[in-house]
Amino acid sequence: MKALILVGGFGTRLRPLTLSFPKPLVDFANKPMILHQIEALKEVGVTEVVLAINYRPEVMLNFLKDFEDKLGITITCSQETEPLGTAGPLALARDKLVDGSGEPFFVLNSDVISEYPFAELIKFHKNHGGEATIMVTKVDEPSKYGVVVMEEATGMVEKFVEKPKIFVGNKINAGIYLLNPSVLDRIELKPTSIEKEVFPRISADAKLFAMVLPGFWMDVGQPRDYITGLRLYLDSLRKRSANRLATGAHIVGNVLVHESAKIGEGCLIGPDVAIGPGCVVEDGVRLSRCTVMRGVRIKKHACISNSIIGWHSTVGQWARIENMTILGEDVHVGDEVYTNGGVILPHKEIKSSILKPEIVM
């Protein structure tokens, strides 16, 4: 089988992290976001992954080349010269996706984190005999999204309602699809929306089905959702592979610590924390609801919550970082500095406190 991942462009919503790496290569739970997807695809027999991309394809391919060998999977790029929406990239990559076997192929949005129940999706798609199957997820506030209205008994999609004023359902598109090659005949090589143009036409022919996604789901394309997504991911990991989570008197709740990280004495870590490779957490540090990326040093008695600490940054002694502070790569926060939210661009030094959320350039 084959898969296409819609990588897209500049990842502006996740800056300053995407100033250093393309968004799919930003670490999530101690590995690049896109690697979570590629590993799950490999498990169900996908042998080739096509990345639909219009920004820095050489960075993506160079980084993923090691994983090609480790996973035994082929990774290629289909590069757009102009933005083609969410359907145009499928037409552009047609020759890479169609091999004459007639097998369906996966399409994924690169921002989506879930348990990736691809085996169940394959079974559902074959059993229902549709041309396309989309995964949907239930949300508490459907008025913020485009709602998928479907027959509960059959899974057949009836219509799509964009940001409904009245309640029509609570299921939204989860950004995970399984499509027959014939879907490509419906798509022209031009900027096109698969959600607003292609799927409604398939639905009108009674050939579009929806499978309700089991487990958690989150689009982690912006910082607040990234933090929420980490909590949901760690909750899921507790149920599936609890042995991968850290344990000890200094651990509270779900915490993921890379084996090469070093944790000092008297720390309190958790809940909902990921500490990446090569990190050094000195004595007396308090961490909660945060991600600490590769190569970070957190000095004695610092406190970090609801924040993301970018690669190779340093947080000084007794510093306090909270309220959705996002440090880019190689940021150095001084001793006793307080940051109350904000975005700090890469390679900056913060010597004085930030009392209101701001962008530090």
UniProtKB/Swiss-Prot annotation:
Task: Extract the CDD domains matched here.
Answer: M1P_guanylylT_B_like_N
Q: Which residues does the record give as diphosphate binding sites? A: G9, G11, T12, R13, K23
Fetch the InterPro entries from UniProt: GMPPB_C, GMPPB_N, Hexapep_transf_CS, Mannose-1P_guanyltransferase, NTP_transferase_dom, Nucleotide-diphossugar_trans
Keyword tags: GTP-binding, Nucleotide-binding, Nucleotidyltransferase, Transferase
The pathway noted for it is: Nucleotide-sugar biosynthesis; GDP-alpha-D-mannose biosynthesis; GDP-alpha-D-mannose from alpha-D-mannose 1-phosphate (GTP route): step 1/1
Catalysed transformations (reactions):
alpha-D-mannose 1-phosphate + GTP + H(+) = GDP-alpha-D-mannose + diphosphate
Record's GO cellular component terms: cytoplasm
- Name one molecular function that GO assigns to this entry: GTP binding
A Pfam family of the record is GMPPB_C
Where GDP-alpha-D-mannose binds, per the record, is at L6, V7, G85, N109, D111, G146, N173
Q: Could you tell me the superkingdom of the organism this chain comes from? A: Eukaryota
* One GO term (biological process): protein glycosylation
EC number of the protein: 2.7.7.13
Nucleotide-binding keyword on record: yes
Q: Which family does it belong to?
A: Belongs to the transferase hexapeptide repeat family.
Tell me, in a sentence or two, what this protein's role is. Catalyzes a reaction of the Smirnoff-Wheeler pathway, the major route to ascorbate biosynthesis in plants.
Protein name per Swiss-Prot or TrEMBL = Probable mannose-1-phosphate guanylyltransferase 3
Organism listed in the record: Oryza sativa subsp. japonica (Rice)
